[in-house]
């Protein structure tokens, strides 16, 4: 669903990792049952995602496939393949999960905008021209995000303007 960039650990952190992996097995206590995890998934699916936020996800992903439709013709030469509809689903589900973890029953734009790079970066296939110009998927994503307007904060269900 995502490709999260993680820096290398410090030497101290790497030492701890090496100790844990190569040392004796330690007992691990379950913190949740499979049933409880299933219940959490069902609760997460109840988080409201406003149609304007869903449309934002669709536009972000679509702009990687048809950049000229979004006045992004300058990036078309850098993309061999854009993201598929699975990226749209990943953005929506990711925003829903973040909202749930943040204790809300509805997703806000910031729940989605922080995930765009993680969801899209491994789904874009850059052209040889992009590689020759030293461009990264994240740079292309930033151009798309600057062009596609973030929706106004959607109201929670049942609220009126």
Per-region residue spans from a language model:
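Conserved C-terminal "switch" segment of AAA+ ATPases
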Residues: 3-75, 101-105, 109, 130, ...
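C-terminal engagement/docking regions of AAA+ P-loop ATPases
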Residues: 69-161
């Amino acid at each position: 669903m995502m490709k999260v960039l993680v820096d290398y650990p410090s030497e101290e952190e790497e030492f701890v990792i090496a100790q844990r992996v190569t040392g004796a097995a330690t007992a691990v206590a379950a913190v949740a049952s499979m049933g409880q995890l299933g219940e959490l998934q069902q609760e997460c699916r109840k988080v409201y995602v406003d149609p304007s936020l869903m449309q934002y996800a669709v536009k972000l992903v679509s702009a990687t496939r048809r950049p000229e439709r979004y006045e992004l013709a300058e990036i078309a030469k850098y993309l061999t393949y854009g993201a598929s509809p699975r990226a749209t689903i990943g953005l929506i589900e990711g925003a829903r999960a973040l909202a749930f973890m943040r204790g809300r029953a509805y997703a806000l734009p910031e729940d989605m905008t922080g995930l765009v790079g993680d969801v899209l970066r491994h789904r874009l296939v850059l052209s040889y021209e992009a590689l020759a110009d030293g461009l990264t998927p994240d740079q292309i994503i930033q151009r798309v995000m600057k062009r596609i307007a973030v929706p106004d904060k959607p109201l929670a269900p049942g609220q009126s303007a």
